[in-house]
Amino acid sequence: MPLLDPDTRSPAESSAAQPQRLPFPPVTYSHILHCSYHHWQPRYRTLTPKSRAIPLTPSFVSYLRADGIVLPPETTRPQGDDDLDTFSDDGADEESDPSVEWQEIHSQIKSTISEFGGKVTPKLNWSAPKDAVWMSATNDLQCRTPNDIYLLLKSSDFITHDLEHPFDGCVPDTDDSSEAPATQPDIPYHLVLRKYVNFNPSLEFRCFVRNRVLLCMCQRDQNHFDFLFSLRDTLRSRIQAFFDEKLKDTFPDPNFVFDVYIPEPHQRVWLIDINPWADRTDPLLFSWLEILQMKDPIGIKEEDADGPEESFVRLSLNGANPTVVEVNGDEDCESEEEDVGSADDGDDLPFLPEFRLVKRDDPEAYSFSTPQYSAHKLPREVVDASLSGPGGMSEFLGKWQDILAKQTQEDTDSDDGR
């Protein structure tokens, strides 16, 4: 998701002097690798949706890096004899089949698709090709064949970033025992195939952890969902308990960002992804400057989520006179900041991790008509030419140059006639 300008989301920040560089701690090579799916998923296997991670060979990685989109020929042929003449017998398809270099991976992909009921969603170590879903017939990450997967992977800028720039802005891990200049570690690339599930995007949330403290969280989808406000305290309690029990003391790094999905009846939390604590990770409804300057929550929550009424206790540390405020969890509060302030206007410290939702009147809400990742899209003519292989792209470029030359000539003739 494209990063938003912090000034557009935090007017209070725009009036203050902002540092030219966000005050992130150094992002190390190991932190990026710890956030790779192949590293963290085995540890949290029971917390994640069903998936398979297929180790990739250098030849397959080279295929993903190569220019153009050349797909293996489909192996399913028509049943009728009348259609057999549509297939060439001269071996041209076999010669242009890129999968001959990685037949084992091709076979694993096909068997995994079959194992997962015929539909999967793909990603590499860190990213899913969400910016390329416009290439899909279903306009989502649903893939039914290996070629569906290859098309998404090779059309995605996010995948290109995983392949070419995974350690941008990173520093080597400190090692006082070695004075040799550190080199970037090798990356064991994996193709992750997750069983396709039609997730409800309104129930996906991004959570930010600093120094092993759950700092804040927000919805991932940037549309307004009115029902979320009455569920906010319940969902926050679920996420906090999940973090405390499963992630707080088990993830290798103290700072990270994780995504969860909490489907109805909102009893179970699924771990979807773990992301680096770095500006490459989209802060969504926050700004990174806001998160980095945020104070740790100090509240203690006591909640019976299964009871008829939910409540929690806020401990307000205000000089020598601590106060206790009980808040009804059923209140439909659109602005959590206003709710906190009403409990104790003089308290500067947050009681609980802030849970930010898109408000009804938020200018970013109701973005159903705005195509997501539209900056990554290409004209259909370019896509069609790339699907035809190197020859198709060369032909397209030749036609494009002819069009430009003709346009230049017309402009010149028009100027001469004046």
Curated annotation (Swiss-Prot):
Tell me the Pfam families matching this sequence: D123
Query: Which UniProt keyword terms apply here?
Result: ATP-binding, Chaperone, Cytoplasm, Magnesium, Metal-binding, Nucleotide-binding
Gene that specifies this protein:
cdc123
Q: What is its main location?
A: cytoplasm
Protein family per UniProt? Belongs to the CDC123 family.
Gene source species: Neosartorya fischeri (strain ATCC 1020 / DSM 3700 / CBS 544.65 / FGSC A1164 / JCM 1740 / NRRL 181 / WB 181)
Sum up the protein's function in the record's words.
ATP-dependent protein-folding chaperone for the eIF2 complex. Binds to the gamma subunit of the eIF2 complex which allows the subunit to assemble with the alpha and beta subunits.
The ranges of region (Disordered) come to 1-23, 71-101
The name on file for this protein is Translation initiation factor eIF2 assembly protein
Acidic residues compositional bias, start-end: 81-98
Which of this chain's residues are annotated to bind Mg(2+)?
A: 273, 275
